Amino acid sequence: MADPRPDPDELARRAAQVIADRTGIGEHDVAVVLGSGWLPAVAALGSPTTVLPQAELPGFVPPTAAGHAGELLSVPIGAHRVLVLAGRIHAYEGHDLRYVVHPVRAARAAGAQIMVLTNAAGGLRADLQVGQPVLISDHLNLTARSPLVGGEFVDLTDAYSPRLRELARQSDPQLAEGVYAGLPGPHYETPAEIRMLQTLGADLVGMSTVHETIAARAAGAEVLGVSLVTNLAAGITGEPLSHAEVLAAGAASATRMGALLADVIARF
């Protein structure tokens, strides 16, 4: 039986056309996805020329997690026209992965050759501190799922662009790097699971980004991943974890994170 759902690429093209029509911009060359806790950083990126509810775009599903606005902004940064996705949906909200990665595919269809994927993450390394931005050097997809269907054998050797990471370090030479472990959520990890992740080589842990990275690379875009350490992972401090803690850490770091993103994007 034929799949009655729209073709993902066609749906992305439809969304891209609406974005172009509503913003008056034929192509946006950079896209930014703001993760949990990153929403307050929007103000530091610059003034948007257009703000669209994501629910008005073909294929987009409004996010339900706290700290995700569900808006798409068109923002000029330096010589670039940037699509800012203020909020993302997660697989743990019950969505098929084709909808989770649809915003990235739509941004690519709208012209974005660079995807800046941000997230909130738990820190697993002793040298990582709450409020610290960390460049993602690689990831562990521990969700047991892929957004790709069929014979799409995408090379992920440099899933997170070394070129873009070097540009980010030109903006802030103190930026650390780490391996991000993507888990399904929505529950936080147990201390035993954190010890397992450390053994596997993870430095950061969260519930997003890995599927978007795979979809972006499959579409031919470069990816820069940036985690904001919003808490130390389970068992490290002995304190319980909460989403409120994540949002508070993001709010406290908002100006710095927004300024960092704006400066890095201007260097692209």
From Swiss-Prot:
InterPro entries: Nucleoside_phosphorylase_d, Nucleoside_phosphorylase_sf, PUNP, Purine_phosphorylase, Purine_phosphorylase-2_CS. One of its GO terms (cellular component) is cytoplasm. The keyword Lyase does not apply. It catalyses: a purine 2'-deoxy-D-ribonucleoside + phosphate = a purine nucleobase + 2-deoxy-alpha-D-ribose 1-phosphate. GO terms for biological process: deoxyguanosine catabolic process. Coiled coil: none annotated. Pfam families: PNP_UDP_1. Pathway: Purine metabolism; purine nucleoside salvage. Phosphate binds at S36, H68, R88, I89, H90, A120, S208. Keywords: Glycosyltransferase, Transferase. The keyword Glycosyltransferase applies. The purine nucleoside phosphorylases catalyze the phosphorolytic breakdown of the N-glycosidic bond in the beta-(deoxy)ribonucleoside molecules, with the formation of the corresponding free purine bases and pentose-1-phosphate. Cleaves guanosine, inosine, 2'-deoxyguanosine and 2'-deoxyinosine. Belongs to the PNP/MTAP phosphorylase family. NCBIfam families: PNPH-PUNA-XAPA, PRK08202.1, PUNP. This is Purine nucleoside phosphorylase.
